[in-house]
Amino acid sequence: KNSLLINETGIDSNSTFRRKTSKSDEPFKIIWIGKFDFRKQLPIAIKSITAMNQRNVELHICGTGNDDAVNEMKRMAEICGIASKCHWHGNVSHDKILKMMASSDLMFFTSIMEATSTVVLEAITVGLPILCFNTCGFGPIVKDFAGITVELSNPYKSVQDFAHELSLLYQNRAVLNDISTRMLEKRQELTWEAKAKKLVRHYEEILKK
């Protein structure tokens, strides 16, 4: 039987936030958003930044967990030698998140269990390229036009794969700008209005049979 996939979240077509142009002589600003829990896999992000071994990198971490989880993540950053590259923002308001996205070069989304995360659609709204796993509801969207994906494997290989992609993007910011342009051109396909029209169209086609 044929199946129809329509992701369960949409983008805000009225948003005025737009991502900045990436420049090679500026810090490589990466934003990570989520809870400090197993699903979100912040340790993979921290270890990937460590493995890419580039000096002019900033990892902006938006989100939090219980005291033990926060202390553990900060301790991991120190042990990995990237504490100075990590900026811990805690819980951030929606408007501030959009502003931070607009001033970032890349969203690093390390979640391994998710539907179509709202922050992925918000990044697309802003035109912020995404680096993530090719899994769950968000993977196919990112792989299609919104960024770069790596295959879900094991923690060690994931860190190596992400670090490889991060290094390539760090060295060639024009790739990020090209992805951003493509995102803004195609994002209308993911608005709530477009999804509603698509759903109605398919219902009408079914009723005609």
Language model regions located:
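Donor nucleotide-sugar binding/catalytic pocket of nucleotide-sugar-dependent glycosyltransferases
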Residues: 1-18, 25
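Conserved donor-binding/catalytic core segment of Leloir-type glycosyltransferases
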Residues: 22-40, 46-49, 60
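Glycosyltransferase donor-sugar binding loop
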Residues: 33, 58-73, 90
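Nucleotide-activated donor-binding/catalytic signature segment of Leloir-type glycosyltransferases, i.e.
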Residues: 72-92
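Short alpha-helical donor nucleotide-sugar binding micro-motif in glycosyltransferases
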Residues: 91-92, 99-104
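Aromatic "clamp/platform" in nucleotide-sugar-dependent glycosyltransferases that forms part
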Residues: 112
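Short hydrophobic beta-strand element within catalytic cores of glycosyltransferases
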Residues: 129-132
